[in-house]
Amino acid sequence: MKVSVVGAGVIGLATALTLADRGHTVTIYDPNPAKGASYHAGGMLAPTAEVVYKQEPLFPLMQAAAAWYPELIDLTRRYTDKPTGYRTDGTLVVAGDRADSTHLDQLRAYQHMHGMEVERLTTRQARGLEPALSPALAGAVAIDGDHQLQPRAFTLALIDAARNAAVSLRTQQVHDVGTLDADQVVLAAGLGAANVTGWYAGAAPLALRPVYGDILHLRVPEHQYPLLTRVIRGFVRDRAV
């Protein structure tokens, strides 16, 4: 089967590689491969830590996506030696004060209610795992199933793997999927999907909006490296960090 994939971020590249590995003829389109949301992502694979109240329909999808990553990493490594930055050290979520610790307990109860594994730790246990944490923390939980990778490294690895799997990568913009020579089209263009036509009738069916965040890159002095091994998340004055 001939498949066209629109969008060369993590989702589009992973889809293209998987389909090519299964014997399909795949072409992927993106004017700037791996330079969109995937380039700016933090790399947390956190279906449990990123749970938000009243978004229950998303939870099975989040869990299934995270569970697929080991298989995807193995598939990528079959086609390339480039690093992915994939790590399975787990995640700690910490609380800055007593109110934040209460919030953490309430969220943990909600996560347990939905079948997610979250372990309450003492602050001493948390600092035993990550000595760089402050002794003034009010609480902590461990989420061993929430992992991490380096998005920029991973997308470059996926591009190399896809090419080695005979995926054709075309650096061009697709405005209308009806112009593509394909038996099936996969639309994986993120926010750009709202500007692609040819797959619906009437008004555009997707009401997409960006989610804003800040990322600060810090250089760790060699004598302190590695400063941390796990992903550290937290609640500080009732704000997620």
Please describe what each predicted stretch is.
Residues 2-27:
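N-terminal Rossmann-like FAD-binding beta1-loop-alpha1 element of flavoenzymes
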Residues 36-40:
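N-terminal glycine-rich anion-binding loops that anchor highly charged ligand groups
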Residues 17-22, 31, 44, 82-87, ...:
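Active-site substrate-recognition segment that forms the wall
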Residues 30, 122-123, 169-173:
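Short loop/edge segments at beta-strand edges and connector loops
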